[in-house]
Swiss-Prot record:
Name this protein carries in UniProt: S100P-binding protein
Keywords: Nucleus, Phosphoprotein
Lineage, uppermost ranks: Eukaryota, Metazoa, Chordata, Craniata, Vertebrata
Compositional bias segments (type: Basic and acidic residues): 77-86, 162-185, 280-291
Cellular location(s): Nucleus
Organism (species): Homo sapiens
GO molecular function: calcium-dependent protein binding
Amino acid sequence: MMCSRVPSEQSSGTSLLPKDGAPFSWDSLDEDGLDDSLLELSEGEEDDGDVNYTEEEIDALLKEDDPSYEQSSGEDDGGHVEKGERGSQILLDTPREKNSSYSLGPVAETPDLFKLPQLSTSSGHGPAHTKPLNRRSVLEKNLIKVTVAPFNPTVCDALLDKDETDSSKDTEKLSSLGEEMREDGLSPNESKLCTESEGISPNNSAWNGPQLSSSNNNFQQTVSDKNMPDSENPTSVFSRISDHSETPNMELSCRNGGSHKSSCEMRSLVVSTSSNKQDVLNKDSGKMKGHERRLGKVIPVLQTKTRTNVPTFSQSNLEQQKQLYLRSVIAHIEDPEDTNQGISGELCALMDQVHHMQHSKWQHPSDLTTRNYARRQKHLQRYSLTQWVDRNMRSHHRFQRLPDFSYS
């Protein structure tokens, strides 16, 4: 790779030129402001190599590496531009070199940090040879290198070969899967839909291939699209990316063990039904209107609870208990056993006697919760007292004694 090299003298020489365009000379500078110690090598620039180069040798090496540098140095030798003013020139890339090289301008520096060129100020008439410098330190100090990744056709060939092998493997998988579908009795459309949902088409072979880096995948897909003609490229990159984004879950569900074919068929049917739900053009507004499902008002349904633990009694059983109770009361009246127990005590003793006469499963006479009907299952309607009387007056004779109120 060829890189544009801009010496550090550009920034220093440009900053030292007068603004009014007057000719520049080194004699105009104040010699008291120049420091010869800057020309000496610092600790990091000490010569640590086996070969030392002078400034002329460095210029010759730079001319061999960069033709533009040779052109600029040739103009300097012709006398058009002085060697001290070489820092004010800006190297521009030719149109031929724009594709492979980049040129960077002078490095922005503050006025306090300008570096003086490698010149001697003893005579003040021109530059003199200084101490030989190490080439590596000079290049690191004065040059700005830009590296660009080269285009290697062998890498593209290797990726294309790998893509072809993957596509051949996927084609074999497709043929074997098609035979299995025929054996199971699936129609060709269903098997095709299943394979498309799995992403086992030759165009989507990169999806099932080995996991490469994202840059390699994008590069491989771009190269394969460029090499394939328009007539042989059925789907675009965008459609393939959308298919990949929609079908990874279906791939996993279809690939996992168990009911492989049934789950794959179900997933393919879901994909076909979802793809059929396309936007419908509204004739009135002229806008795209999708399928919308409106839910009506949800009315909660009261769940009726059946009471299975409510004991019900037969009419004969209740009649038997009543007759037993009456006989016990009559016998107690005719022949009382204990007359000093009082009225309440006598009643309690009588009820206990009736309760324990037959068996203890009978309900105690003092318990008034005995019912011979099941509890209502439907919701009871609320009535006012007047409405209830109007509904039940004819069936209950006790309300006949109530006088009729006449409102005048």
